[in-house]
From Swiss-Prot:
Cofactor note: Binds 1 pyruvoyl group covalently per subunit.
Protein known as: S-adenosylmethionine decarboxylase proenzyme
Active site per database record: S63 (schiff-base intermediate with substrate), H68 (proton acceptor), C83 (proton donor)
A GO cellular component annotation in the UniProt record: cytosol
UniProt xrefs under PANTHER family: S-ADENOSYLMETHIONINE DECARBOXYLASE PROENZYME
Subunit annotation: Heterotetramer of two alpha and two beta chains arranged as a dimer of alpha/beta heterodimers.
Keyword S-adenosyl-L-methionine belongs to the record: yes
Effect of S63A: Loss of processing
Length: 130
């Protein structure tokens, strides 16, 4: 079924705790993940919490990538939402799995904006005139 976008909701477990608490490294790896997925980066913002933890977003022309880390638990919650045919959120997922050194992951893929639910014809172009 065609959809406007794909949304990966990922749980990363047993990650490197030092990586999870390094805001500069997290931002660098999230941007690299966006690049590897084929996305176009618009902007990003990241914040390190005290005493630990990082939250951040990479806004891409095709939607967004977000991360929230809990270094004390070795855990990261990651959303990779991409639109369009040219961006592959699974490439971003694989990059981040390696970068965060996750030993276990759980991921669910959601189709966002399914054509049949919205009433878009299957042969319709991805972007329609407004």
């Amino acid at each position: 079924m065609k959809s406007l976008g794909r949304h990966l909701v990922a749980e990363f477990y047993e990650c490197d705790r030092e990586v999870l608490d390094n805001v500069q490294l997290i931002e660098q790896e999230m941007k690299q993940a966006a690049y590897e997925s084929g996305a176009t980066i618009v902007t990003s913002t990241f914040h390190r919490f005290l005493p630990y933890g990082v939250s951040g977003v990479v806004v891409i022309s095709e939607s967004h990538l977000t991360i929230h880390t809990w270094p004390e638990y070795g855990y990261a919650a990651i959303d990779l939402f991409t639109c369009g045919e040219d961006v592959d959120p699974w490439k971003a997922f694989e990059h981040l799995k390696k970068a965060l050194k996750a030993k276990r992951v759980h991921v669910v893929e959601h189709e966002r904006g399914r054509y049949d639910e919205i009433g878009i014809p299957e042969d319709s172009p991805h972007k329609a005139a407004v």
